[in-house]
From Swiss-Prot:
GO terms for cellular component: membrane. One of its GO terms (biological process) is lipid A biosynthetic process. Its EC number is 2.3.1.191. GO terms for molecular function: N-acyltransferase activity. The gene is lpxD. Catalyzes the N-acylation of UDP-3-O-acylglucosamine using 3-hydroxyacyl-ACP as the acyl donor. Is involved in the biosynthesis of lipid A, a phosphorylated glycolipid that anchors the lipopolysaccharide to the outer membrane of the cell. This is UDP-3-O-acylglucosamine N-acyltransferase. Homotrimer. Belongs to the transferase hexapeptide repeat family. LpxD subfamily. It catalyses: a UDP-3-O-[(3R)-3-hydroxyacyl]-alpha-D-glucosamine + a (3R)-hydroxyacyl-[ACP] = a UDP-2-N,3-O-bis[(3R)-3-hydroxyacyl]-alpha-D-glucosamine + holo-[ACP] + H(+). It is an enzyme of class 2 (transferase). InterPro entries: Hexapep, Hexapep_transf_CS, LpxD, Trimer_LpxA-like_sf, UDP_GlcNAc_AcTrfase_non-rep. Pathway: Bacterial outer membrane biogenesis; LPS lipid A biosynthesis. It comes from Bartonella quintana (strain Toulouse). The active site is at residue 257.
């Protein structure tokens, strides 16, 4: 269950409220007045717990669960115990998350580390900086010359915002974040240790050694983007590095200079995207994917974890392996290798 020491529910909902808010169909109306007070996993459920089951392979766990209500699809209904309210929906996890945001709004809205929304007298702020209303800047933050920060944004202790940067409305800049040479939209969350706008890895070799190439572009992060802890995004060499609207980037990701990431992309931890690569809207990269430079990845592409992308990928395709290739080809090759191993073992 949710830890009530850190996360206190803001309200209580009945099962009928939950059905109305999400549009789910309540199959057993006699449970309408049951109170939902928390979210849980199937195994950790207790009094007042709401759970979800999206895939049939997890449905057996319902039998031993103490949850009072479950979001599930039509195909799982017959597995649900009679003691649970059944909320049928085609998107159980999405509806579960929606109710979570209603019950625990503080869990998705970053709060000031010191509990007060104010501009601290112990922040280091250049006199030319401009702020919208209800901006919070905590002690130890550094705000450079000509910086502009939109209404409702929170700049945490030890964050550094470099000269001329723009931060939009309702943004969250966590501790130890550095932002330079960047324009950041509204509702952008940068989690601890993120570095935005530093030099790209631009060097050229010659007889006299390695020379640095000036990095003269920017980073542009559009509305609704979230960037995980200790991720780094380099500014462009001449063109901008761009992160598209609504994209979510996990912890420990490296995005090199001139990269263009489209709208609503998902990039999991430890990915590395080399310079001047572009990724189309709604594409997804699993953990530890490496992408070579100047690659074009289309829209709605899925790339399996641990893959190494060395070639362009058309729209809508699923690739995996290293070097990455279409799923069907990759699976055939893996199966062939497995069979070779079996033959050798039999000969022994």
């Amino acid at each position: 269950m949710a830890d009530t020491f850190f996360f206190t529910p803001s309200r209580r909902l009945t099962v009928a409220n939950v059905a109305e808010l999400t549009g789910a169909k309540l199959l057993n109306p006699e449970f309408s007045n049951i109170v939902i007070s928390t979210l849980s996993s199937l195994e950790g459920a207790g009094e007042g717990s709401l759970v979800f089951v999206e895939h049939r392979k997890f449905s057996d766990a319902l039998l031993g669960s103490s949850a009072v209500a479950v979001f599930c699809t039509n195909e799982i209904v017959f597995k649900v115990p009679e003691s649970m309210a059944i909320l049928v929906t085609s998107t159980p996890q999405r509806d579960f998350a929606q109710i979570g945001r209603i019950l625990f709004p503080d869990s998705v809205k970053p709060m000031p580390w010191f509990g007060q929304r104010e501009i601290s007298p112990y922040a280091h702020i250049h006199p030319s900086a401009k702020f919208g209303h209800d901006v919070c800047i905590e002690a130890g933050a550094v705000i450079g010359k000509n910086v502009e920060i939109g209404s409702g944004s929170l700049i945490s202790s030890t964050a550094v915002i470099g000269e001329n940067c723009r931060i939009g409305r309702d943004c969250y800049i966590a501790p130890k974040v550095t932002v330079q040479y960047s324009l950041i939209g509204d509702r952008v969350y940068l989690y601890p240790g993120t570095c935005i706008g530093q030099d790209g890895f631009g060097y050229v070799g010659g007889a006299s050694g390695i020379e640095k190439v000036p990095q003269l572009g920017r980073v542009i992060i559009k509305d609704g983007v979230e960037i995980g802890a200790n991720t780094t995004i380099d500014r462009g060499t001449f063109e901008d590095t761009i992160i598209g609207e609504g994209s979510k980037i996990d912890n420990l990701v490296q995005i090199a200079h001139n990269v263009k990431i489209g709208r609503y992309c998902l990039i999991a931890a430890q990915c590395g995207i080399a310079g001047s690569t572009s990724i189309g809207d709604m594409s997804q990269l699993g953990g530890s994917v490496g992408v070579a430079d100047h690659i074009v990845i289309g829209k709605c592409v899925q790339i399996a974890a641990g893959s190494g992308v060395m070639n362009d990928i058309p729209d809508g395709e699923k690739w995996g392996g290293s070097p990455a290739r279409p799923f069907k080809q990759w699976f055939r090759e893996v199966a062939a290798l497995r069979n070779i191993g079996k033959v050798k073992k039999e000969k022994r």
